[in-house]
Amino acid sequence: MSHTTITNFLAGVIARPQGGNITSDETFRRYRTIVRTSATIGGNEDSRTTSIFHEIGRAVNTKGKALAVAGMEAPLVEASYPTNAVLVEDFIGLAKKYTNFSATFEYSSLAGVVERLARGLAACSVFEDVTSTDLRGNNPLAVHALATYDGPVNSLTSAVFIPRLVNNALTGDVFAVLCNCVAGEGGTVVTDTIELDANTRQPIVPEVGPLGVPGAIVDALRLLGSNMIASDQGPLFALALTRGIHRVLSVVGHTDEGGIVRDLLRCGGFGLPFGGIHYGLEEYSGLPALQFNSAAATAAYVDGIALVTAAVVAHADPGERYNGEWFPTFFDGTTHADTMRRSGDSTEGTAAMADRNRAQLLARQQLFWRPYITALGACFSTAGDISVAERFQCAASHSLGADPRHLRLPSVAPYFWIEPTGLIPHDFLGSVAEEEGFASYCWRDTTRTRPAWDSIVLSGARDTTFSAYHIRMKGARTAWFLAHWLGHPENGLGATRVRQLDPNAVLHPGPCEGNEQVRDRVEADLPLTDYLWRRGQSPFPAAGELLNLTSEWGILFRHVTFTDDGDLNPEHLPAAHEMADTTVTMTVGRPIGIAPGRSNAGDNQARRARTRASVELSAASRRARVFGRPDVGEMPTLTSAPAPIPASPAYDGNRGGEAGGVTGRGNNRSAAPGHASWSERQADGVPVNVTPHHNALRAPPFPRQQGALGGGGNVPLPPAPGAAPPPPPGPPNGPPAGPPPSDDGSSNPAAPVPTAIHAPPAAAQADRAEGQ
């Protein structure tokens, strides 16, 4: 199965690389990402610049440990996959040419070779004397040539066929590094032709020096990438490469528990490699070529992969559902034997808590590995089937040791390794974590604008001095208002006051000296900054920072303060008429190398304990795992009043009447279906025919008459004394007078009107006269 590479996502991750080999455990390669945010205050743009720091150290202190082979009791996991049918036919052709070669290539397993190549590349960025021989980790090199070997060659178990044509004018050292990596994984190399020593009959494989090894490894990785992509195993290739990088390097996490993913990637190993490597496939370009062989260039190349694969963890967080809302994945390591504390209190972690968190993590790990491996495939531009990679990593993760230090906490939100802003686009996967605002804010060299709050509604009246709002903020990370004002030199957050908050619904608040419990902070009318963590390498809140299960906040903003003399002092906040419509614009650069040095990572002092909120959120996770849905009929314990019930119109039966009636408010005010006063009456029964009729206010139209009408209306007035009589109804020689004009303004002539109502015709009057 072939896939077209659309973009090279890993190209140019780091700008201006500095630093090379890491000489001590206290030395870290450091990078700085510049972030600019802006908002409108008083009609003027307010801008500030901050930085995100990333640090990368070494996980081992010698190259021998970095490239050590798996022991006899190492937990290895088989990760074989079906080989592409076209490649199978090509490899089987060798069995027809060489009778001593019994080939079966229906399945292949090259992920272990990819992981060792990645470990060698990472070791080249840490140590300065890595050669191709070091890649096999003191294992013997076994190479069989089909043309010169006089015994049978079996490829069913642990043999990898590597043709000599993997070398060309540009990639002349690929064969050497591939042979040593296969040997380091315990496999045997089979090739078409090779030079043997005349005296010892040992194969002669060239040795590549420290300057040539990094480039040769990258070329070999691109070759294996094209082979595994051809068999629809691009995600497995990306996972194996990621595991190899993080087994040698150590990316410093931005949260206490975020490094647990690094520990999981170091668990287990791949089984013995077997299969064949084809040299004639389309070149894989998802992994950039290494342009320079300097130590700084190699370090920047490897660190770019390490940072991207660590940052995308936040985008793959499967999350929890609580009361219809999405929250980051959360594990509670306490039990009923632990004391229930208030939000804001802190409890020291224990080994028992670490083991309980570990059990929960492994029980739900598949929900994380599925999107994470998909994300790795997108990073390396290697789409394909993720089932083999997912099954392998789920099995390998069970070798995670007991009492992991990253889980030795009362509660953890594990899937936030480092700040992804500047490394990953905000919509990279289309995951729920991205939609809810817990992933990256913005990608490198781009600009993005968002509302300052997810939802904000004015509470009461406002003026130019104070304004209060009901704000929706399920976590500190979802509020872009904090992305701009948190750590701002003008300290605008000091003019905020948290007035309404349910302390029992708050998770992972920050420290506050003198008011440790969240309840006391609300009563003390403290600003929003006293609820947040201490800032370290990232200026932005973490995904698990200051979670609120109700998502509701009542915050008072002081726009102006006055001195004792009446002088006003404008606060660094949007004006009262601007607050509800405030937006924040963010522009992010790419990581820039700075001088290596000691780590500046500090303790964020997050307050963790067994609280009502931690029990509720962790219970939702367990209910979802057991029953398939997180909802439960039990009402959570909160100290805030429920939402007000909307008022409904009064029932007609409660209106009027005499005094003394009982009209309880607890009764239902709406009539039952079918009642005459039911507001939604429905038609029913057999339809009736249409019948013309006259209602009580209408009558058949009668023609109007001339002269007086009955009832005293329209009586002609008598002529004045000495005046001439009135003229006849019509002119002497003209037609009789017509009816009055139509009331509706119509110009159509009306029908003739008789002179009197029920007047007999002229012929009938003549007959009557003759009869008399």
Curated annotation (Swiss-Prot):
Residues 743-766 have a biased composition (Low complexity). Residues 654-664 have a biased composition (Gly residues). One of its GO terms (cellular component) is T=2 icosahedral viral capsid. Keywords: Capsid protein, T=2 icosahedral capsid protein, Virion. Signal peptide: none annotated. It is found in: Virion. Residues 593-772 are annotated as: Disordered. InterPro entries: Totivirus_coat (IPR008871). It comes from the Viruses. Its main location: virion. Residues 716-742 have a biased composition (Pro residues). Belongs to the totivirus major capsid protein family. Capsid protein self-assembles to form an icosahedral capsid with a T=2 symmetry, 40 nm in diameter, and consisting of 60 capsid proteins asymmetric dimers. The capsid encapsulates the genomic dsRNA and the polymerase and remains intact following cell entry to protect the dsRNA from degradation and to prevent unfavorable antiviral responses in the host cell during all the replication cycle of the virus. Nascent transcripts are transcribed within the structural confines of the virion and are extruded into the cytoplasm. Binds and removes 5' cap structures from cellular mRNA. This is Major capsid protein. It comes from Helminthosporium victoriae virus-190S (Hv190SV).
